[in-house]
Amino acid sequence: MHRYRTHTCGALRDSNIGETVRLSGWCHRIRDHGGVLFVDLRDHYGITQCVVDPDSKAFGLAEKLRSEWVVRMEGKVRHRPEGTENPELPTGQVELYVADIEVLGPAAELPLPVFGEQDYPEDIRLKYRFLDLRRDRLHQNIMTRGAIIDSMRRRMKEQGFFEFQTPILTASSPEGARDFLVPSRIHPGKFYALPQAPQQYKQLLMMSGFDRYFQIAPCFRDEDPRADRLPGEFYQLDVEMSFVEQEDVFAAMEPVITGVFEDFAKGKPVTKGWPRIPFAEALRKYGTDKPDLRNPLEMQDVSEHFRGSGFKVFARMLEDPKNQVWAIPAPGGGSRAFCDRMNSWAQGEGQPGLGYIMWREGGEGAGPLANNIGPERTAAIRSQLGTKEGDAAFFVAGDPDKFWKFAGLARTKVGEELNLIDKDRFALAWIVDFPMYEYNEDDKKVDFSHNPFSMPQGGLEALTTKDPLTIKAFQYDIACNGYEIASGGIRNHKPEAMVKAFEIAGYGEQEVVDRFGGMYRAFQYGAPPHGGMAAGVDRIVMLLCGTTNLREISLFPMNQQAMDLLMGAPSEATTKQLRELHIKPNLPNK
């Protein structure tokens, strides 16, 4: 018989009744029923009920057992007494009648319980992550994560992609965030960088003649904490293809992502034939470039109905041609209480308020806006929006470039408050035609709006003849349920176009050569047209596990202050380590 176990704690069935077996695992729950001890023994595979009665020679030791002690138990498998079966457990028809116990690893008093799923302070959970990972929900999430990555790999290989690993120690490059720098001992004063993404390497692979590449790539960004991103590192399904246009990337990747979602959606519908939504349309209709299409609400421009109207606040705004008025329909939201609640919410978001119109019986408009613009204009708004009796609409006015984010938040808030969002499906879409450039208000200059290596629509001619802020790029995202889960583009593979694109963003040719020398050099020796994308593994897993917290699908994450409470990172380096690296700390004054 095996030293520790003949079966796992999830393996025993009726067919094992009468067998003498050994199990090893953790004491999940211990109960004393009239002097008989019941121990739920747990391992990775499941739970088996073990029974120790006072006549057993193991009873004295069993009385000393506590939660999360690791033990080996030996005994006979028997059927549970009639009426005590547990249909929720695969082992729920049987129990182990224990004859012998060996303690393999006692446990100290627990800082957080493993049995049950009660909430606990996050810092405690992260400090004792090894205990937290024993809890069923988190344990299953991590197993689901592994299965999702397996599904990604299988589907990518079915599409003809090859998996390669790119370097982790590389050169620093401006890709939108700070790099994590690694000092070189061999080259004093010089630094490697951990890759923010394998962007240059995957493009170099295409120039090296490899046709289709992918990897599950670790990425590192030294960013300030954000609610929707783990500090430090994340993983992405990284993809690149040669001799492709945008539609070729879509045709290759849409079935991969759809298939992964269908594998793990637990029966929830997944969008087939994803819509293609231009970036500008997404902002206008949904107030975001990652719309939640489960929310049926679409915003509309209703400026004409307020131009020259009796509502002077909007009328005066519309004298400036760049200003607009957008309407957010609210089906079934035509109560004063709801409209006042939305108005208070808007004020809490730092806005002066949220104008509204309610439609009463007979289609008559009500509220301050309706009173100011009159019944004819109110009826025209109702006709445009398709609102009915008992509905409402909310209005946001000003420069759309400044209010679209708030309008999008208001659309989401209305959808949530009125229970319009279908929580039981995954709504996927391509967002296309991103602007190549944007105006950076902080630096007072034109900058890249997305990926600097993307091909501008119109190529070099567009870069030399058009206003940069009007140029669109062959860039695209995948949106799902209000999250951006992937981003990509067709690459700028011509050196003269690459130099011009960076020049517009304020980089001289020599700086481009210095920063991207390897790729710039490769462009001189025959670069194929190529493109690709990167899908966020963590966010996809988060969505499919039904959580909104990325720490619930990650093994050993940092906290929001970018600290690893389990391992004690970051930590101070020793004087010897610093001396070897020729580094002297220059700490800020406290």
UniProtKB/Swiss-Prot annotation:
<dbReference type="InterPro" id="IPR047090">
    <property type="entry name" value="AspRS_core"/>
</dbReference>
<dbReference type="GO" id="GO:0006422">
    <property type="term" value="P:aspartyl-tRNA aminoacylation"/>
</dbReference>
<feature type="binding site">
    <location>
        <position position="491"/>
    </location>
    <ligand>
        <name>L-aspartate</name>
    </ligand>
</feature>
<comment type="similarity">
    <text>Belongs to the class-II aminoacyl-tRNA synthetase family. Type 1 subfamily.</text>
</comment>
<dbReference type="InterPro" id="IPR004524">
    <property type="entry name" value="Asp-tRNA-ligase_1"/>
</dbReference>
<dbReference type="InterPro" id="IPR006195">
    <property type="entry name" value="aa-tRNA-synth_II"/>
</dbReference>
<dbReference type="InterPro" id="IPR029351">
    <property type="entry name" value="GAD_dom"/>
</dbReference>
<feature type="binding site">
    <location>
        <begin position="221"/>
        <end position="223"/>
    </location>
    <ligand>
        <name>ATP</name>
    </ligand>
</feature>
<feature type="site" description="Important for tRNA non-discrimination">
    <location>
        <position position="83"/>
    </location>
</feature>
<dbReference type="Pfam" id="PF02938">
    <property type="entry name" value="GAD"/>
</dbReference>
<dbReference type="InterPro" id="IPR047089">
    <property type="entry name" value="Asp-tRNA-ligase_1_N"/>
</dbReference>
<dbReference type="GO" id="GO:0005737">
    <property type="term" value="C:cytoplasm"/>
</dbReference>
<feature type="site" description="Important for tRNA non-discrimination">
    <location>
        <position position="33"/>
    </location>
</feature>
<dbReference type="GO" id="GO:0005524">
    <property type="term" value="F:ATP binding"/>
</dbReference>
<dbReference type="InterPro" id="IPR012340">
    <property type="entry name" value="NA-bd_OB-fold"/>
</dbReference>
<dbReference type="Pfam" id="PF00152">
    <property type="entry name" value="tRNA-synt_2"/>
</dbReference>
<dbReference type="InterPro" id="IPR004115">
    <property type="entry name" value="GAD-like_sf"/>
</dbReference>
<dbReference type="GO" id="GO:0050560">
    <property type="term" value="F:aspartate-tRNA(Asn) ligase activity"/>
</dbReference>
<keyword id="KW-0547">Nucleotide-binding</keyword>
<comment type="subunit">
    <text>Homodimer.</text>
</comment>
<feature type="binding site">
    <location>
        <begin position="536"/>
        <end position="539"/>
    </location>
    <ligand>
        <name>ATP</name>
    </ligand>
</feature>
<keyword id="KW-0067">ATP-binding</keyword>
<feature type="binding site">
    <location>
        <position position="221"/>
    </location>
    <ligand>
        <name>L-aspartate</name>
    </ligand>
</feature>
<feature type="binding site">
    <location>
        <position position="450"/>
    </location>
    <ligand>
        <name>L-aspartate</name>
    </ligand>
</feature>
<keyword id="KW-0648">Protein biosynthesis</keyword>
<dbReference type="Pfam" id="PF01336">
    <property type="entry name" value="tRNA_anti-codon"/>
</dbReference>
<feature type="region of interest" description="Aspartate">
    <location>
        <begin position="199"/>
        <end position="202"/>
    </location>
</feature>
<keyword id="KW-0030">Aminoacyl-tRNA synthetase</keyword>
<dbReference type="InterPro" id="IPR004364">
    <property type="entry name" value="Aa-tRNA-synt_II"/>
</dbReference>
<dbReference type="InterPro" id="IPR004365">
    <property type="entry name" value="NA-bd_OB_tRNA"/>
</dbReference>
<comment type="function">
    <text>Aspartyl-tRNA synthetase with relaxed tRNA specificity since it is able to aspartylate not only its cognate tRNA(Asp) but also tRNA(Asn). Reaction proceeds in two steps: L-aspartate is first activated by ATP to form Asp-AMP and then transferred to the acceptor end of tRNA(Asp/Asn).</text>
</comment>
<dbReference type="GO" id="GO:0004815">
    <property type="term" value="F:aspartate-tRNA ligase activity"/>
</dbReference>
<dbReference type="InterPro" id="IPR002312">
    <property type="entry name" value="Asp/Asn-tRNA-synth_IIb"/>
</dbReference>
<protein>
    <recommendedName>
        <fullName>Aspartate--tRNA(Asp/Asn) ligase</fullName>
        <ecNumber>6.1.1.23</ecNumber>
    </recommendedName>
</protein>
<feature type="binding site">
    <location>
        <position position="484"/>
    </location>
    <ligand>
        <name>ATP</name>
    </ligand>
</feature>
<feature type="binding site">
    <location>
        <position position="175"/>
    </location>
    <ligand>
        <name>L-aspartate</name>
    </ligand>
</feature>
<keyword id="KW-0436">Ligase</keyword>
<keyword id="KW-0963">Cytoplasm</keyword>
<dbReference type="InterPro" id="IPR045864">
    <property type="entry name" value="aa-tRNA-synth_II/BPL/LPL"/>
</dbReference>
<dbReference type="GO" id="GO:0003676">
    <property type="term" value="F:nucleic acid binding"/>
</dbReference>
